[in-house]
Every structure is written in C-alpha cells, then in structure tokens.
From Swiss-Prot:
InterPro entries: aa-tRNA-synth_II/BPL/LPL (IPR045864), Ala-tRNA-lgiase_IIc (IPR002318), Ala-tRNA-ligase_IIc_anticod-bd (IPR018162), Ala-tRNA-synth_IIc_core (IPR018165), Ala-tRNA-synth_IIc_N (IPR018164), Ala-tRNA_ligase (IPR050058), Ala_tRNA_ligase_euk/bac (IPR023033), DHHA1_dom (IPR003156)
Cofactor field: Zn(2+)
SMART domains in the record: tRNA_SAD
Biological source species: Rickettsia conorii (strain ATCC VR-613 / Malish 7)
Annotated PANTHER family: ALANINE--TRNA LIGASE, CYTOPLASMIC, ALANYL-TRNA SYNTHETASE
One Pfam family recorded for the sequence: DHHA1
Family of the protein in this entry: Belongs to the class-II aminoacyl-tRNA synthetase family.
Listed EC numbers: 6.1.1.7
Task performed by this protein: Catalyzes the attachment of alanine to tRNA(Ala) in a two-step reaction: alanine is first activated by ATP to form Ala-AMP and then transferred to the acceptor end of tRNA(Ala). Also edits incorrectly charged Ser-tRNA(Ala) and Gly-tRNA(Ala) via its editing domain.
Protein name: Alanine--tRNA ligase
GO molecular function annotations of the record: alanine-tRNA ligase activity; aminoacyl-tRNA deacylase activity; ATP binding; tRNA binding; zinc ion binding
C-alpha cells in the first residue's frame, strides 16, 4: 500500500472526482453564511444545504470539495477530548462528493470503492460496509460492486445509519465504510459491544437522500434524489500513512516537531498530549481569525477564546514563559497556505491576535492557577469544586468552565455545574436590573402574518424620490388597526411599495412625508424587518389615514443625499484600508448617518497619525477623480468570482446588487449611493479608537460636514487664542511654558505635602501604638495622590525598624489604602497581605504590592469608624 502525504490525499480525492465530471467548489468560510442554526460549518454539506432543501440552485449537479470544518460548540462539542484521543479535533478537513439529482446509490458506491481500492490502493479485505437495516438496495450494490458477502455488510438498526436534516425535510439511509487496522488493536465491528475500540475506523460516510419527512409519522419518496458524502482527511491520511493516531500524520508531526524545537521539551509522557492540543488548536484559532472571528466573551468569539486559552494553558504546562502560538503560525501557513490562501492574506493579523490574546491571558493565568490550587488542595479523587470558585475563575481570571474542568480532569475532580450556572444567572440578573430596556412588546408573529398575507415591500428608492403607494397595514400599540385619527399619534405604516429606504446594511432609514387625500403624515424613521418588509415609523400631522387608500410617498431629498454621500464614502474607505493597513482588514460593522459615518474593522493595533493622513489623502484622491458609480444585479457566485467584497455572516440572495466605483471598489450592497465619487465632496476622519480586542472604530464626515467641522475647529482655535492672549503661531510655545510651570508647581506642592506628612523618630514613638512588639501608626488623610503617600510611608518605615505605617486617604466616594512595613519585620508582617485584607474590609476587591509596600482601594467609607479594631485584629492574628 502506497504511503501518501496529507497534501497528496486531498489532491488525489479532488482530482479523481474532477475527472469524473464533478465541479470543484472551493471551501466556504467557517462562518455559515445562510444558516443561523449553526455556529460553525461542521461538514461539507453545509454550503449546499439550500440546494438539498430545494431552496437554491447551482449551475452544476455534481460537486467535490475539501471543506474546512470546526466542531467546538453546541451539539458537536469535541473540545474536552481533543489531544487525548486518536481522532478528536476542533478543526478538520472534510472531503466530499455530492450529487444534486444526478447519480444515486450505485454510482456513489462505485466511486467510493474505486477510489479506495484502485487510486489509494487499500486492501479489499481490510474494508467493511455498514448500511441501514432496511436498505436492501445498498446491500445489493455492495455485493455487486465490491463483491462483499453478508459477513462484510453490517446492518445497523439505529439512527446512526439514517440521516435527517431535522424533524421535517430531506432524509435517507447512510452507508459507511470502515477500515480494519488489524487484530493487534483492540476493538470490534460496528454494532458490537466493542465498537468503540480503535481497530475498525469509519473512513467514509455516504448519505442517500431519497425521502422527505412530512411529519413525525409520514415520509414520501423524493422525485430528485441526492448524494452527500464525507471523508475526514486526517483519518484517511492516518490509514494511508499506516498509523493509528491522527496526530501521527505528517501535517501534525511537522507542527509538533516545530513546537518542540522552540519549547525544548521532549514529545513524551504527559507533554505529548499538550503538543497535540497546541497543534490542533493552532489550526482552529488561525482559520477562525482568518474567517473574521475575533476573541470575545460571547458567541463565536467566545468559542475562539476558549480554544485559544486551552492551548495557551498547555503551552504554560510545557514551560513556555513567553507567548508561543504566534511563533508557530509561519509553520502552519507554510503547510496549508497554498490550499487556503486566506491564511497567507491574514497572516500578520492572525499573528497579532494570537500574541495579544496570549499576553492578556498570561497576566491572569498564573494567579488563576494559584487560586485553583489553593481551593483544591484539600479535595481528593471524586470530590467536586464549588460552582462559586469555578465562576470566580471564569469571571475574574478569564478561565472558561471547560478549561477549569480540563485542568482538574487528571485528578478526577468534577466541577459543580449547577452552582456555576446559578452564579452566572445571578450575574445576568444583576446586569438586567441595571439595564433600562426599550419596553417594546410587539411580537414577531405580527410581521410574519403581514409578510405571508402581503408579501415583500417593493423598494423604489434606487430611482425614485417620490411615488404613489397603497397603504396595506397600520399598526398602533402593537395591534393592527384600520385607520389613524388622533393628531400627533405615533404609529407604523406598511405599503405595497415605497421610495423610503428601510434601515439595513449599516445605512439608517429615510425620513420624509406621506400625503393622502385629506391627510399628512410625517415619517420620522424607516425600518426593515424580516429582510424585506419596509416599515415607516410615522406621526399623524393632519386628517385621517386609512388602510387601503393610495398616498403620495415623498422622501427628504437632502437627508437621502447626505446618506448617499456617507455610504459611498464607506466603500471607498474600505478599499483604501485594504491598501494602507493590509488585506486582513474586514468590516466588523458600520453606521451610515446623514451627518457622519462609522466604520468598524478587524485590526489589532491603533491606526497611526501617519496612516490616518495617508488614508484621508487616498480617499480624497478617489473622490477628486470623480469615478462613475454603477450598480449591477448578478448571481452571488459571479459577484464573488469578480472580487466583490462580501460581509462574513451576511445573508445574500441568489441574485445580489453589486456597487462599483471605478476600479477602486467593488462590493455587494443594497444601500443607496452617489452617481459619481466627486459628489461626496471631501472626506475627513474625526476619530479612531478601540472598541474590542482586535477591532478598531473609525468615524468620519463628508461633504458639507467637513466644512462645518473645519469652522468649529477654527472657532475653537480662536477662542483658545483669546483665552491665552496670543496667536496661533505662538500658541504651542505658550501652552508648553504653562505646562512646564505647572510641573514646577506640582513638584513644590509634592515637597510641601511630603514635608507635612513627615515625622521625627520621637513623633513616631509618641503617636504610634504598640502591638505584639511592633509599632502601628495609622493616619486618615484627605485626597492626596497615591505617589506621595507611598513615598511618605516608605520614608517613615526607613526611620524606624519596627514600624507598620497605614495611610487611608478619603476621596469622593472612594478610599485609598497605603501600607508600609519596615524591612526588618517583613518576615512577620506583609504589607501586601495587610493592604488586601483592609481593602476587602472596606468594600474593595484587593490590591497589590510587595512585602514592604502595598496599596489598595475601598469604597465603604462608613466602616472607617471600625478601622482601628480591624487593624489590631489583623496584626494580632499575623
């Protein structure tokens, strides 16, 4: 049997099916574009789901893919097993061939058998097939094509061999192909009590979609039958490389050996599992970031953070003191970047995110591990860590629950899940209590009913500013009504068509006026719901408005033009950001308002002043070039092939609107735009800031609002000149002189304050209290800077060898604690411990410092009356 590399297995699979007239379809993003039920793409069929359900069409009826997939959240959560078993992964590649109404069972079985035995040269006597127990047709084909006897065809009665998309929809029996690793490995055939062993391994699964489930008890035969198959690349490569563990294949071994050369720990014993975790999680993290996911505390971003932090903990176990994951990225790009070019394009961005996340987590990892050690040192095998401690590790130290479980697994200590969830619910309740909601109570069902009865609203606003439209629904207080009579009443209005743009794609909705026979309605906002219902938020100004009557809808043209200007500017900005900051930049959000624009991007560091200037210059150059702005309707796939930018996670129809601005920008967009880039006038960035880890926000203004901004700045400058009694040419010099003078005054004030806090040895002796052979001196002071208190306390403890000095400074609603201990007695009394305990007593959360000097905070000013007793009890216990 020939030994194949991972790359050769992937290539041969795709080449084989291409030779058999299958279209090679590139892998989709790990983020499902059209399936809100999935967090991540977890199989090859996901990108074809709408084809299988009959809701979409492709220009081909046979396809082959190598699909990047991820299972680390929801139903398919393999995270805790990854690294410890032979075949569990978070990220993996699924090879698959698909038929949409073309070939069916016989041809699918033939393709699989021919590829395995002739192309991959697997011994026929090593292969077995499973079928659904009633699928006699598949059994007959296995006998005909492979020559199998009944002993090699295993009938399975469970749903393991019957696939369905849900309670209703396409479904059908499966046939799986198993490979026998040999009797030297423990395990039994599928369906036996030993089936969970590693001897017989599933290498290919074929789903024969031949039925449609109508309801719980009824299914019918499909007129168009389809095939969905899946072969795990890593599993198949292990078979072809004669190894029984996926982590022993060439791709993983390259990453593991590269890691070993950096950390200098042998790949053996417990370390072996850590190397495997790191290799797997490096792939998952890198591909997720390349597909636009950023570490966060919710949704996909939190799954990514869990994966990253688990790998970082294993790097810590290998003794890595510095960030490690980003150093491994070049090896991964070298191994997989040619097949998945998004890795190469986003390499610098991925590297930056990996490094930053590891630096951030390392700051709390050791403290969290220390707490976990302290809390579990009395626990033995079979005991349980309290949910309260697990939640503290999560909330304070950033330990995902499964990371805590992973750490305790080897000691056979469980975690109190119920207690953890109770703590989580309490936190959410506190958050809800502090949040003032909108109070809206309308139900989704109302909008579904309207859409079902009347269909989508036709948008006329690309070409018309006003139009005659029919009013089909009026909603007041979440209820459908036939008319609106009360002047100044707020209500919602839906029409069969409208020139008003409903807020979507970042562009806010239009405003304007609706005139009926004897009525006038002010439109104060326009929304879009269920993707295609346009809702006018209205106030009745005159007369009465009725369902069924025709009215003249007229948008505010100036308002719309300013929206067009700022929306078109975001497209140009997006293109320029790619050029200036790098191809890794992806849009994470936007707001197009009539007076400004906001654009959120994936970028791991602040945009420099030089970069901002360059971005502004390039955007304004494109504006001055006055490129024509054109819009075209085309198939989504054609638009993507032409290089049109699409947003991750955005749902697109089969036909999309493509907006082109010269040769500068090409994007999928349903918004409204200027006719030529010159209509924008000019562009000016007003702010740049961080809004989350790895996400930056740029705000800017265009056109007349740039002039307004310049006038405001000019007015401000003149006011400052007047206040400083100087002109703009001398302003900087004057301000610098004042700042220098302020520094001198601050130094003088600092000296004065230090002098006022200083005490002689005699004064210390007189004012301090004697406790257990040492001197305690406590002073309550005003809102004095911590730096001064630190210096004053340190000065006093240097004068006397057995002094504990405590300052508590009272500010507005807060307390500042400073504790200093003479170095001669730090073996008995620790300033850091004293400060932390005082902080907790005074309503703080602890502080930090050294044995001789520490500072902390508090906020319970009322407890100061008992501070002497607390200090005495602390020191007598110490």
């Amino acid at each position: 049997m020939t030994k194949f590399t991972t790359e050769e297995v992937r290539s041969k699979f795709i080449t084989y099916f291409k030779a058999n007239n299958h279209t090679h379809v590139p892998a989709s993003s790990l983020i499902p574009h059209n399936d809100p039920s999935l967090m991540f793409v977890n199989s090859g069929m996901v990108q074809f789901k709408n084809v299988f359900t009959g809701q979409g069409k492709r220009p081909y009826n046979k396809a082959v893919t190598s699909q990047k997939s991820l299972r680390a959240g929801g139903k398919h959560n393999d995270l805790e097993n990854v690294g410890y078993t032979a075949r569990h992964h978070t990220f993996f590649e699924m090879l698959g061939n698909f038929s949409f109404g073309d070939y069916f069972k016989e041809q699918a079985i033939y393709y699989a058998w021919n590829l395995l035995t002739k192309e991959f040269e697997l011994p026929k006597d090593k292969l077995y097939a499973t079928i659904y127990h009633t699928d006699d047709e598949a059994a007959a084909y296995w006998k005909k094509i492979a020559g199998f006897g009944d002993d090699r065809i295993i009938k399975i009665k469970t749903n393991d061999n019957f696939w369905s998309m849900g309670d209703t929809g396409p479904c059908g029996p499966c046939s799986e192909i198993f490979y026998d690793h040999g009797e030297q490995i423990y395990g039994g055939l599928p369906g036996t009590k030993d089936e969970d062993g590693d001897r017989f391994i599933e290498i290919w699964n074929m789903v024969f979609m031949q039925y449609e489930q109508i309801d719980k008890d009824t299914s019918i035969e499909l007129s168009q039958k389809s095939i969905d198959t899946g072969m795990g690349l890593e599993r198949m490569t292990a078979v072809l490389q004669h190894v029984n563990n996926n982590y022993d294949i060439d791709l993983f071994q390259e990453i593991i050996n590269f890691t070993e050369n950096i950390v200098k720990v042998k790949v053996e014993g417990e370390a072996k599992f850590s190397y495997r975790v790191i290799a797997d999680h490096l792939r998952a993290s890198s591909f997720l970031i390349a597909d636009g996911v950023i570490p966060s505390n919710e949704g996909r971003g939190y799954v990514l953070r869990r994966i990253m932090r688990r790998s970082m903990r294993h790097a810590h176990m290998l003794g890595s003191k510095e960030p490690l994951m980003y150093k491994l990225l070049p090896k991964l790009v070298d191994l997989m970047g040619n097949v998945y070019p998004e890795l190469k394009r986003a390499e610098s961005f991925i590297s930056s995110i990996l490094e930053q996340e590891e630096i951030r987590f390392k700051a709390t990892l050791e403290r969290g591990l220390k707490l976990l050690t302290e809390e579990t040192e009395t626990l033995t095998k079979g005991n349980e860590l309290s949910g309260e401690v697990a939640f503290k590790l999560y909330d304070t130290y950033g330990f995902p629950l499964d990371l805590t479980e992973d750490i305790l697994k080897n000691r056979d200590i469980a975690v109190d899940h119920k207690g953890f969830e109770e703590q989580m619910l309490m936190q959410k309740a506190r958050a809800r209590k502090s949040w003032l909601g909108s109070g809206e109570s309308k139900t989704d069902q109302l909008w579904f009913d309207i859409k079902e009865q009347h269909g989508s609203t036709e948008f006329l606003g690309y070409t018309l500013n006003e139009a005659k439209c029919k009013i089909i629904a009026l909603i007041k207080n979440n209820n459908l009504v036939n008319d609106i009579k009360e002047i100044d009443t707020q209500f919602l209005l839906i029409s069969n068509q409208t020139p008003f743009y409903g807020e979507s794609g970042g562009q806010i909705g239009d405003i304007g006026t609706i005139f009926a026979k004897d009525s006038e309605v002010e439109v104060i906002d326009t929304l879009k719901y269920l993707g295609s219902i346009i809702i006018h938020k209205c106030i009745l100004k005159k007369g009465q408005i009725n369902v069924g009557e025709n009215a003249n809808f007229s948008i505010d043209i100036r308002y719309r033009q300013n929206l067009r200007i700022h929306h078109s500017a975001t497209h140009i900005l997006h293109a320029v950001l790619h050029e200036v900051l790098g191809k890794h930049v992806t849009q994470k959000g936007s707001l197009v308002a009539p007076t400004y624009l906001r654009f959120d991007i994936s970028h791991s560091k602040a945009v420099t002043n030089e970069e901002i200037t360059l971005i502004e210059d390039k955007v304004n150059e494109i504006i001055r070039d006055n490129h024509e702005v054109t819009t075209t309707l085309m198939a989504t796939e054609d638009a993507i092939k032409q290089g049109a930018m699409a947003l991750f996670g955005e749902k697109y129809d089969s036909e999309v609107r493509v907006v082109k601005m010269g040769e500068t920008s090409l994007e999928l967009c349903g918004g409204t735009h200027v006719r030529r880039t010159g209509d924008i006038g000019c562009f000016k960035i007003t702010s740049e800031s961080a809004i989350a880890a790895g996400v930056r926000r740029i705000e800017a203004v265009c056109g007349e609002f740039v002039i307004t901004l310049m006038r405001e700045k000019d007015s401000l400058l003149k006011s400052i000149e007047s206040s400083f009694k100087t002109n703009k040419n001398e302003l900087i010099t004057k301000v610098n002189n004042i700042l220098e003078r302020n520094k001198e005054v601050e130094k003088e004030l600092e000296k004065t304050l230090l002098a006022s806090l200083d005490l002689s040895i005699e004064q210390i002796e007189k004012q301090s209290a004697q406790i257990t052979g040492i001197k305690l001196l406590y002073k309550k002071v005003g809102n004095i800077d911590n730096k001064i208190l630190r210096q004053a306390a340190e000065n006093l403890t240097k004068k006397v060898e057995d002094l504990i000095m405590v300052y508590i400074a009272e500010g507005i609603g807060k307390l500042s604690i400073t504790v200093a201990v003479s170095k001669a007695i730090t073996d008995k009394y620790n300033a850091d411990i004293i400060a932390k305990k005082l902080s907790l007593f005074l309503g703080g959360s602890g502080g930090g410092g050294q044995a001789s000097l520490a500072q902390a905070g508090g906020n319970d000013i009322g407890k100061l009356t008992n501070i002497h007793e607390k200090l005495y009890s602390l020191l007598t216990v110490s």
